[in-house]
């Protein structure tokens, strides 16, 4: 559990129960999780305290997840932070758009198994660590 202690993950989601659930799952694995209720709050949080990873919902009332993603990638402070989409948009075309057009690091459809989330996060963070310059 120790290696994850310093890993900050921001989860941007408009459903408080989902934030609580994901926080519980990831805290048990040693990750530090900060939840942001909605896109605008998430954008502010990520710019003030850039995390190691962003978990992002797509369907939020205040700021659409794709709009937020574009803003993150256009900002020098946040453009290199990996993003995993967690959404109820489960159509194959949505997944293709996310992974191959937008180039998000991973795309998880709700509902998901806790192990699926953990494996995705570990894969993305390991890939990021391996691609960082020495």
Descriptions of predicted regions:
Residues 13:
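Conserved acidic carboxylate
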